[in-house]
Amino acid sequence: MSDFNDVAGGLLESAMSTAEIGGDNYGLALNTNTKILYYNVEMFSEAGIAVPKTMDEFADACKKLSGTNANGQQVWGYDEPGLSGWNLCPFIWSMGGSLTNEEQTKATGYLNSKETVAAIEMFANLYKENAITGWNSGDIPMTDGFGTGRYAMLLEGPWKVAELAGAYPDFKYETAPVPAGDGGSISVLGGEDISMFNSANKDAAWKFMKFMTSEYAQVEMAKCGQIPVNKTALETDTVKAADFAPYIEQLQTAKSRPTVACWSEFDSELAAAVTEVVNGDKTAQEAMDELATKVDALLAE
């Protein structure tokens, strides 16, 4: 694969970072995505508040938009279906926090930093004030809750456009960047990679990988709602005509979750720790201190 660097160089660097561990590449980025803010136009208009541009404004909007609607139903300012890294990273990073050091070898001092703890505290406090919900069994599914006016805001990806159009075609919503904090407006990087393992036909496998990341294949995938990672494909009329602009803008600052072998366990431990905080079993500092110690051990394995 003497042309690996040439092929990889034609793909978005941010997306390629998801296929890298310890400075070594293990594949090519295939597509990419990220999450942006979706908000209910009518709910914001009726409340007389502006779309939040900062995390402080976001927290304030969550409180003002929660309560009881005209039908006597409970409504919430924000819906979040989980407490994993995919869900929490935009808040942690935007508020200036982090999960590990740059080398991804240490969590203590990062995962339990004052900035990370502040992000978790904000989340927990909003939950305790009944301003956000979504991850508990029995909660209204995200698309239904948003489309029926029970949730005022979401952080979601491009797939939500088709879901809402199919289920609630008359529902009016708009999108905006992730509210910014001390760290800026930073969302989480998603998408898929394509890799070769123990193929008996390495040349054919590499040819297929190159085809899937070519301009032609990437434009075809864009027609199905996938955001291309091929830089040339991003400049085509087909891709520019798609409703990707808000996501592509957010991708300029989006970050990937730690590319470490222990990420699955790391992520599970993160969700468990934050659950303890939102349930009031531990303070954010206590939970993050304990979590940082656990993750240090995982990273050292």
Regions found by a protein language model. Give the residues of each.
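Hinge/lid segment of periplasmic solute-binding proteins
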Residues: 1-35, 91, 170, 174, ...
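Extracytoplasmic "Venus flytrap"/periplasmic binding protein-like
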Residues: 1-11, 42-53, 152-153, 163, ...
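Short, solvent-exposed loop/beta-turn-alpha elements that line the ligand-binding surface or hinge
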Residues: 1-11, 68-71, 76-78, 97-118, ...
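Long, aromatic- and glycine/proline-rich binding clefts that accommodate carbohydrate-like moieties
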Residues: 14, 18, 169, 222-272, ...
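Extracytoplasmic/periplasmic solute-binding protein
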Residues: 21-30, 35, 59-108, 151
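Extracytoplasmic/periplasmic substrate-recognition and gating elements
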Residues: 23-24, 46-47, 121, 128-129, ...
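Short helix-initiation/N-cap motifs at beta->coil->alpha
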Residues: 55-59, 134-148
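Glycine-centered hinge/linker elements that transmit conformational signals in sensory
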Residues: 62, 105-135
